[in-house]
């Protein structure tokens, strides 16, 4: 499938101002704006990366530009959520949707590995659709716990937190310029591990209406 995707990207860079995708370099893999004349063979699909964030930043900086983006199902869900919040301009974005394989869906426990972008102004989906994976068995185990057992479970999980902000930084639908998790009124600076459950509930409640099942 990678060659089919590269072929479409190669076509679109001649029509658009650029296509956002992942590029392989000697230093590793990172998001990149492929443009006319670039080596499209450097385009790769792994590892997963929150492409909606990168796309939003590009669109804000170059408001009149017409971009494309290579996006998985979770990326497209993020793009829709960002659009609702005026962080993505759909009229200036062509989506190249990628259907994940069954193996990829199982790794992420993804229930919807196929991009659902029929309502997007301009898009094309590549790859064979596969059924969604079963939920993580831990979900069923957690549902059978009492409230006290659930509280104890989360205490044990969050005591591992070192306040690295990785949960925030990897979130595909985080776009706030001022983060509540860095506000000393709510989160004491320098305190490790951060207060339970204040730090973690702020993050959870702040994102609760934007969840896209990214499994990050």
Predicted features by range, described:
Residues 1-160, 168-177:
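Iron-sulfur-associated redox domains of electron-transfer enzymes in respiratory
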């Amino acid at each position: 499938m990678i060659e089919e995707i590269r072929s479409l990207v190669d076509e679109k860079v001649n029509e658009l101002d650029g296509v956002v995708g992942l590029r392989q370099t000697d230093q590793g893999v990172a998001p990149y704006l492929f443009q006319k004349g670039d080596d499209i063979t450097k385009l790769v699909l792994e590892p997963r990366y929150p492409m909606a964030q990168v796309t939003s930043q590009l669109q804000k900086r170059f408001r009149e530009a017409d971009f494309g983006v290579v996006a998985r199902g979770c990326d497209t869900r993020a793009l829709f959520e960002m659009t609702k919040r005026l962080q993505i301009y759909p009229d200036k974005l062509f989506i190249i949707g990628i259907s994940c394989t069954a193996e990829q869906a199982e790794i992420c426990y993804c229930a919807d590995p196929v991009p659902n972008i029929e309502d997007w102004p301009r898009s094309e989906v590549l790859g064979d659709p596969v059924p969604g994976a079963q939920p993580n068995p831990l979900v069923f185990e957690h549902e059978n716990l009492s409230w006290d057992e659930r509280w104890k479970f989360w205490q044990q999980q969050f005591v591992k937190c070192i306040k690295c902000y990785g949960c925030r930084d990897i979130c595909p639908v985080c776009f706030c310029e001022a983060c509540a998790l860095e506000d000393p009124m709510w989160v004491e600076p320098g305190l490790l591990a951060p207060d339970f459950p204040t730090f973690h509930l702020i993050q959870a409640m702040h994102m609760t209406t934007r969840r896209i099942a990214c499994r990050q």
